[in-house]
């Protein structure tokens, strides 16, 4: 194994020292099950709670179809990325942009992948800031309904304070316990969401018709729902970084972990989406827990579990950003790797995502907008494009056809989903007061 890792290694001692300091490449001791809970934490999160809302905007036929097709497409594209991680002997593509550079060239690959990956990871951290704050607020209101109202801003600040500490853990393997807890919480609160909805039961007058007041509303709601579903399958942006933590050869253990992760994802997503929509119909909230008021202790517990999960999710998505920033500072700016460099960089990043989350907490609209604009390319069709370039399947073969079909579907998703999300943000902004 050591020989495999060292094969064709032409790095200088200084380059090795830097790589041993950077968060993505500093530790390669992970087991296959690490990839399971890292991927579950990356994928299952805020998105699962919005799936019944997405169903209400699409109806049974389109909703069920989109959820299942998205599960299949994203499992396929994730498999492609796992396959390509070590396709060049003696080299590992430890970061998404490194794979892009191999396919498109040094400069073009960087320009294509990095902006999209940064948008995905930073926007996800912002959304998790909002989700964590809202979950704490809902917990507070459930346990103390007669207490004085506290602004959402303060709950987001509490969530951020956790990350001012956790963000200084050095690498992926150092946050494994946090990620494992988050993965367990995701399955737990998903189960609570659909079982509590089932226990609540239907009032017998559930409407499964379009939730909009007119055709225009229904069209925009449909577009936003596409973004909700895209956001629910978002782990691709960190999959190579997760695989980088596994010793070489990493393909088999990584894929084993991914398969288990996707089974857990299905157990989380499908019951929440289908049962939540069945119980509430088109009256469902954009976060299903907001519509469940009793028993209050159970809803409070579910919201605490959401809080724990998005704490782990934030760290999973922040780590590649930390790696990018620290790589740039030590390799391009030539700053010396140090505790204070890492401390300053990560503290500023957490503060920035906290500020944006406090200022623009439009949860439903944010999911739709970022889901279509940024997550669709990096999750649905960029792996297919890279696969066609590097693997060169025969024209009109099954592999060639299926990749082009997924590319077209991904482009449609990228085009349509942000329209609905942006409209929801605008509508929310009309009545929103800053830092309320």
Where are the model-predicted features located?
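C-terminal ends of transmembrane helices
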Residues: 165-172, 329-330, 390
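Membrane-interfacial loop- and helix-cap regions that link adjacent transmembrane helices
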Residues: 3-8, 27-29, 33, 79, ...
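Short, hydrophobic transmembrane alpha-helix segments
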Residues: 51-59, 172-173, 365
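Extracellular loop-to-transmembrane helix junctions
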Residues: 54-90
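Membrane-interface "cap" regions at the ends of multi-pass membrane proteins
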Residues: 1-50, 74-79, 93
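Residue-level recognition of membrane-helix boundary sites in multi-pass small-molecule transporters
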Residues: 62-63, 174, 253-256
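Helix-loop interface residues and adjacent transmembrane-helix termini in multi-pass membrane transporters
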Residues: 48, 57-58, 168-169, 247-248, ...
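Central hydrophobic cores of alpha-helical transmembrane segments in multi-pass inner-membrane proteins
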Residues: 46, 71-80, 159-168, 383
């Amino acid at each position: 194994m050591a020989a495999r890792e060292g094969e064709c290694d032409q790095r200088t001692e200084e380059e090795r020292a830097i790589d041993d300091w950077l968060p993505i490449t500093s530790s390669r001791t992970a087991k296959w099950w690490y990839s399971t809970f890292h991927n579950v934490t990356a994928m299952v999160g805020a998105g699962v709670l919005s799936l019944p809302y997405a169903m209400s905007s699409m109806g049974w036929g389109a909703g069920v179809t989109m959820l299942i097709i998205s599960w299949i497409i994203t499992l396929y594209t994730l498999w492609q990325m796992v396959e390509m991680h070590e396709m060049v002997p003696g080299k590992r593509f430890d970061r998404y942009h490194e794979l892009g550079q191999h396919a498109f060239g040094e400069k073009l690959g960087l320009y294509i992948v990095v902006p999209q990956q940064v948008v995905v990871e930073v926007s996800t951290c912002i959304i998790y800031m909002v989700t964590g704050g809202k979950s704490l607020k809902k917990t507070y209101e459930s346990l103390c309904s007669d207490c004085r109202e506290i602004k959402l801003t303060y709950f987001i600040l509490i969530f951020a304070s956790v990350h001012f500490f956790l963000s200084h853990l050095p690498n992926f393997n150092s946050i494994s316990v946090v990620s494992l807890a988050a993965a367990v919480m995701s399955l737990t609160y998903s189960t609570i969401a659909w079982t509590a909805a089932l226990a609540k039961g239907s009032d017998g007058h559930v409407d499964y018709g379009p939730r909009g007041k007119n055709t225009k509303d229904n069209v925009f709601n449909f577009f936003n729902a596409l973004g909700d579903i895209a956001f629910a399958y978002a782990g691709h942006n960190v999959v190579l970084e997760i695989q980088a933590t596994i010793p070489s050869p990493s393909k088999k253990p990584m894929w084993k972990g991914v398969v288990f992760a996707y089974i857990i994802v299905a157990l989380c997503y499908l019951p929440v989406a289908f049962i939540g929509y069945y119980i509430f119909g088109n009256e469902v909230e954009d976060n299903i827990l907001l519509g469940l008021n009793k028993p209050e202790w159970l809803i409070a517990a579910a919201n605490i579990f959401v809080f724990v999960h998005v704490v782990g999710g934030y760290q999973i998505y922040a780590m590649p950003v930390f790696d990018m920033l620290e790589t740039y500072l030590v390799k391009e700016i030539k700053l010396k790797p140090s505790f204070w460099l890492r401390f300053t960089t990560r503290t500023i990043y957490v503060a920035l995502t906290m500020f944006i989350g406090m200022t623009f907490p439009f949860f439903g609209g944010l999911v739709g907008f970022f889901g279509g604009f940024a997550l669709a390319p990096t999750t649905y069709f960029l792996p297919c494009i890279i696969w066609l370039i590097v693997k060169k399947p025969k024209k009109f073969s099954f592999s060639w056809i299926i990749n082009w079909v997924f590319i077209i579907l991904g482009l449609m998703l990228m085009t349509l989903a942000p329209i609905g999300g942006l409209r929801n943000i605008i509508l929310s902004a009309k009545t929103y007061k800053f830092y309320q």
